[in-house]
Every structure is written in C-alpha cells, then in structure tokens.
Curated annotation (Swiss-Prot):
PANTHER family per record: RNASE ADAPTER PROTEIN RAPZ
Cross-referenced InterPro entries: P-loop_NTPase (IPR027417), RapZ-like (IPR005337), RapZ-like_N (IPR053930), RapZ_C (IPR053931)
A molecular function (GO) term: ATP binding
Function: Displays ATPase and GTPase activities.
Entry binding sites for ATP: G8, I9, S10, G11, S12, G13, K14, S15
Species of the source: Polynucleobacter asymbioticus (strain DSM 18221 / CIP 109841 / QLW-P1DMWA-1) (Polynucleobacter necessarius subsp. asymbioticus)
Annotated family: Belongs to the RapZ-like family.
A UniProt-annotated Pfam family: PapZ_C
Protein name in the entry: Nucleotide-binding protein Pnuc_1915
Coiled-coil intervals: none
Amino acid sequence: MQINLITGISGSGKSVALRAFEDAGYDCVDNLPVSLLENLIQTLEGENSERVAVAIDARRGQSIAQLPSILENLRRNHQVRVVFLNADTNTLVQRFSETRRRHPLSTSAQQTQSATLIEAIDRERNLLEPLRAQAHSIDTSSLPAHALRSWIQDLLKDKPTGLTVVFESFGFKKGVPSEADLVFDVRCLPNPHYDKILRPLTGNDKPVKEFLEKIPEVISMECDIIQFIEKWLPHYIADGRSYLTVAIGCTGGQHRSVYLVNRISEHFRAQKDLIDLQLNFLDRHRELDSIPVTKL
C-alpha cells in the first residue's frame, strides 16, 4: 500500500494538500490521532485499498512522539511518504486572524490572543520537529493554494522509494525557503533584469536562456554546482535521506535561478547511471508559482 502522511504546522495548508490527494483518487482521512494510524492501515488493507493519504492530528503530543517508531513499522510492509508543511510565524498568525479560528494547541484564554497563538505555534513546532528530517518539507509562507496543489500533484508523479532531489529556484528578497538543505547564491551573475526587453520575461523563456548561456560566469557556476552535487550526492544517499532540497537563489527568483534550476535538473535527469540508485528529481520555481489566486 502507498501511505502518504500529511503533517506540519496548523495553518500551513494541510487541508489543501489532503484535497489534492483526494482529487488524485487517494482514500483520505483528516485529523487522525496517531494512536489510530496502524488500526486504520489494517482496516484499509482488509478493504484492498492501495493508496491512502492521512492528515495527522497534532493535538496529542505524547502520541506524536510515538510516530517515528510507527512509521518504521509501517515501512516494513508498505511504501510510506511523509509530507511536512511549514510556514513562518507571521504568516500563520495572519492566516488564523483572517479565518478567526483557534489554533488546535491554544492554551488558556487568560492570556492575550496573539500571545496564546504564538505560544501554540511554537509548541507545535517543537512537537513536530523530529518528523521534519524524514519528511518532504514544503514552506507555504508565500505559496498560494493553487501552487501547493500543483506541487502535490508533481510529488505524486515521484516514486515513494529512493532519494528525491528537489531543485528549487527562489528570490532572496522573499527569504530562503525553510525546507532547503543546500543553498546556492547566484546573485553575483549578470542580471537580465537590467535589460528592458528581458525584464518581464523569466528563465523559462528563450531570449533569457540565450542571454545567459553565452556568459562564461553562468556556465562556470552551472558546472560548479553540478560538480558539488555529484560529489556529495552518494553521501546523502548513504545517509538514508528520503529528500534533498537544493535551493538556487537570485534577487527576485525570476531569471538566473530559474534558468540554472532548469539546466541542472535537466543534467541529472539525463544521467542514465543514476537510474539504478532509484533517484527521483523534481524542479520548482517558488516565485513563479507564488502568484496569489486563492489563500490557503
């Protein structure tokens, strides 16, 4: 059975992610206590269910502490993927304020609402932190709902076994993605933004590609990043990781980082000798995907 566990900080978009799994034909369960997870899987096995997505209820901290060992047991007989959704505290406070909902871990009403909410968010972060290391982490701080759904759909194309390498472009002016394991700063490269013709375009467009591919520094940067990843990739595989996020950032996340993510991702996808290692590759463009349409 393919088991997809959705966890993360309340307000980070778990319901949106679960609906994306449901739209893809998965059996879905929301707000399931950890103590019932193994019983649920046994029941679904009896019903010949092949794909399930479960959003975990984090309100019982003692049960959450048992989740890593439960996942280890499930992985003996099933394919298990953990998706961890995160967002910065300011974004979470704003989302809870807009929806007027209480945080699941809110404490006493004697404190002010903002203090109670922030304390609840911090407490939940501490409870769930051990899960992040074995999860595919997505920072939804600047990510609209339609983009999160799209990212989940891309994730479903990925085999739930082996190491998944995510190449992600971003803009430093909006901050480094919290899920990044490796960060490469390419702001030192010539910027197409200063060309009036190229400014409204992106690194996906042919004129920008033609501009950047002729610059020796861009070619050198691309080669250096590839060589670094090729050197250390076997060590990340040996470490038993499920996910490795390589974030490449320029100023706005529109031209240089997008171009390099595409180029580097294409390079690794073309390496036939990596097939035996069960590697999966995803590429994302955070700022290009972050055009607001629907709030989480």
